[in-house]
Amino acid sequence: MKLKSPKSLESRQSPRVEGKVWKVSEEDAGLILDKFLAAGERLGSRSKAAAARERGRVFVNGAEAGRDQIRAPLRVGDEIRVWEDRPGSARRRATPFTAGPLRILYEDQFLIVLDKPAGLLSVPLERRGEEESIFDQIVQHLRSHGKRKPLVVHRIDRDTSGVVLFAKDARTQAALKQQFRERSPERVYLAVVYGHPEPSSGTWRDHLVWDQKALIQKETHPNDPRAAEAISRYKVVETFESTSLVEVRLTTGKRNQIRIQARLRGHTLVGEARYVYGPELLRPVPFSRQALHAWRLGFVHPVEQTSMSFEAPLPEDLRDLLSDLRRP
């Protein structure tokens, strides 16, 4: 697969993505972005302007409006565009999933460690209806051995593949959850992102708040009483023409943490459908899900008190993606 460098926003408009465009006049020069958009002939209110910006639908001179542009005064001739149909904002159809045998990495009388395929929920959610989860599959597995239901310790996103851990009794569950609260487990992910993160290794530290209505993480001020600190350490493993393979180690484990932290730095995950902004033609690598894999999980066995570490091999779709990216 030969990757193309993104061209200018104007020259790569998609007929499926419509937007409104305004040029800043002398009369409006000096206004900040939200106030400009709040005018009645534009979006009509500051709240609508802020919402559009937070959803990544606002572009200034062809680039997404970032943190540094929120308070910067606009200049005569600046082009402001608001995308009305932001690619990825609509609910995406679930990745096709065909049930197969459980890929058990380890099992004893206290816990079970599995390699979860992409497209399968970790645990059932009421709003997902009858969609199958790996929890349901473990229930059937344990039932066939005359045992009780598994107990949730942690979870990974439906379209993220890799290592996930469940307990078999309440005491084991409590001990494992305590390790996660203390941030002691080793949680290592592999992700394919757009761009080349600089520096090539470092720490991502953000304050996030979960938007219950939109079902996404949003960046917020550290003083926000709702703020939750998110910390990840990253290292670029391999670079390609316009993408990179990155190893990410979680210190905290917030929902969608890697996906939003990568996006906040301009390195959206390949295949990302939720944390994506602007025209999809700026993301030229086709992939059916976010390119994220829970590669390694390490923890202390709560009963035997021995250190344990498990790795899930890259699934076929990610192996194929990397092969394509390495191709000249």
Q: Positions of the model-derived regions?
A:
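RNA pseudouridine synthases
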Residues: 1-214, 225-228, 311-325
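Structural motif
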Residues: 75-78, 254, 306
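Pseudouridine synthase
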Residues: 49, 131-138, 170, 181, ...
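Short Gly/Pro-enriched turn/cap motifs at secondary-structure boundaries
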Residues: 155, 222-226, 235, 286-289
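Short, P/G- and charge-enriched loop/turn segments at secondary-structure junctions
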Residues: 100-101, 217-224, 281-286
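Conserved hydrophobic positions within beta-strands
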Residues: 104, 193, 233-236, 269
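PP2C/PPM family metal-dependent serine/threonine protein phosphatase catalytic domain
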Residues: 225-230, 274-278
